[in-house]
């Protein structure tokens, strides 16, 4: 295979500066010189040091390949490592997002009811797609929702997500469950083996929405007991029947012994909110999981009467067991390395063909762009530590594959807030309908070519309103067949992404 034919894009990405650094590695902003688009290249270091971390990375790579939707972050490409059996780092590339919802809430007190409605609609629409694929996110919180100045949100960080199959042992869901307590459903408080349903994600979305309305977390529990205490302060003491369904004995005893509390009316807790919004929020924050609406039911709520359109709220095909068979067995570092390598090949169709046909070389495969990225990342990291923003030396090599970087995490944010941009994000009158009767929020001011703000990176933004094509047309352009695990006699002509 002629590497320089398939990967002759060595000068396409101009690496600019470090925009994030943490235990996982480093994220650099870069310019796609072909399109003028800002991207972020994330280097994840030593991914096989711990099998649990490598498994989380594999899980996320797989899910972001399979769950392609405008409200979910999208991996476009992953650089092919130079050696199949010896690589330790991976480089993934996303378009640059300016911030996350945590920063938006923290920095912006000018959000309007239209913002609240549109934000919740996007989250529920993305969640419907996730849940109909039989996937449960398990870690929804403002830091895992990316935002840009077009008011576009994208769900990210699928490292704790799980795929639910009818015969999957319950324990598989909870082997590494460490989701943030503040957004954790009450049936999960203190229990790693509670009944597992999509309602846990609906609860999290309800907590996020309440935080949007008030500007502060709704249930900032200091521990499990305090978490249950402040939940019941708002919702009232649950019924005896509801308490009996909580599997954790200590939690059951605590709830049974607490003084009887009356629920606080949501109109009192959120005095300035739209009554329709509060009615939906109250349903989403039901103590009993069975009383919460699923994402599809929530989208049909009267609160969204002016923007909902079922044609733009697609369902996903369920994820196949074959994609996640590794969750059902004990795997070694070597197993994980091979599985991650196999998934990376989805972005390199020619190499995938050779791999499936058994003709691929097992050793050093080509003059890798990764080697050149290493030098530039090392240069930037050194200068980043000294506070310099100097750009790295230009590469003298033209073998860089196309992009793709990974999910966000909880590293401390040094994000320049997007309050100015977002406060100027003018929302269209929500009685004004878009194409085929669906209203859409529009940003009259879209940042053009400004410096990327440090912070979260990932996923492309779906433009709303002032666009050359309608939302539906943009979505249809993105809608391609999901890529199930390939049989040994099948090769995807373009990989799983355009």
UniProtKB/Swiss-Prot annotation:
Residues 13-304 form the Protein kinase domain. It is an enzyme of class 2 (transferase). SUPFAM superfamilies: Protein kinase-like (PK-like) (SSF56112). Induction: By jasmonic acid (JA) and infection with rice blast fungus (M.grisea). GO terms for cellular component: cytoplasm; nucleus. Its EC number is 2.7.11.24. A motif (TXY) lies at residues 175-177. Keywords: ATP-binding, Kinase, Nucleotide-binding, Phosphoprotein, Serine/threonine-protein kinase, Transferase. One of its GO terms (biological process) is intracellular signal transduction. It holds the Pfam family Pkinase. InterPro entries: Kinase-like_dom_sf, MAP_kinase, MAP_kinase_CS, Prot_kinase_dom, Protein_kinase_ATP_BS. It comes from the Eukaryota. ATP binds at residues 19-27, 42. It catalyses: L-seryl-[protein] + ATP = O-phospho-L-seryl-[protein] + ADP + H(+); L-threonyl-[protein] + ATP = O-phospho-L-threonyl-[protein] + ADP + H(+). Activated by threonine and tyrosine phosphorylation. Dually phosphorylated on Thr-175 and Tyr-177, which activates the enzyme. Belongs to the protein kinase superfamily. CMGC Ser/Thr protein kinase family. MAP kinase subfamily. The TXY motif contains the threonine and tyrosine residues whose phosphorylation activates the MAP kinases. This is Mitogen-activated protein kinase 15. It comes from Oryza sativa subsp. japonica. The gene is MPK15.
